[in-house]
């Protein structure tokens, strides 16, 4: 088994006569408690990198063995989005460490700092979660009542990326999305009931 976490892997130590392994990770940036993560399973690991100015940023993926090819095929989209956001908003916030994906079995994704947990390598989803590294991780809302700030920026930036890459399709899709949202009654950007996880992440 392999362990994935925030930051950089420092070392792995075998114990119990070589039957167990301890993985030591270190993250050197301030972090909100809800962004701390680790996962352990029979991951396959592959590495890549992206040039950001004068820095070569390691890109590290922990995925299920059966998902390796799809994650490898989707890597270029991550590199493209990383360069776009880096050039638009300044340095990737955790440029002295890494960015990567850790596959998990839930739907969607979670923007854990330096290590996004993700179910699949869907282009729109990976861009949305990457955008959170700037808006949601480096800076985050002071209360769950204002989570729309994190999600609003990430949603906007995924559209920003897709518009650059697929300009004609994105305009049509964006109009359809807006029509779908505005045709529904109710909804509020502010979350009044922060005890309801479903409400916190409700798009309405």
Model region roles, listed by residue range:
Residues 66-73, 144, 196-204:
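Active-site rim elements
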Residues 88, 106, 114, 143-144, ...:
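Glycine-rich, flexible loop/turn motifs
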Residues 1-127, 156-159:
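Hydrophobic helix-coil surface modules that form long, contiguous segments used
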Residues 87-96, 140-142, 163-169:
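Secondary-structure transition/capping motifs at alpha-helix termini
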Residues 128-129, 151:
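Acidic active-site catalytic centers that drive phospho-/nucleotidyl reactions
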Residues 151-204:
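Acidic/His/Gly-enriched intrinsically disordered linker/tail segments
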Residues 130-147, 160, 164-165:
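Catalytic Zn2+-binding segment of zinc metalloproteases
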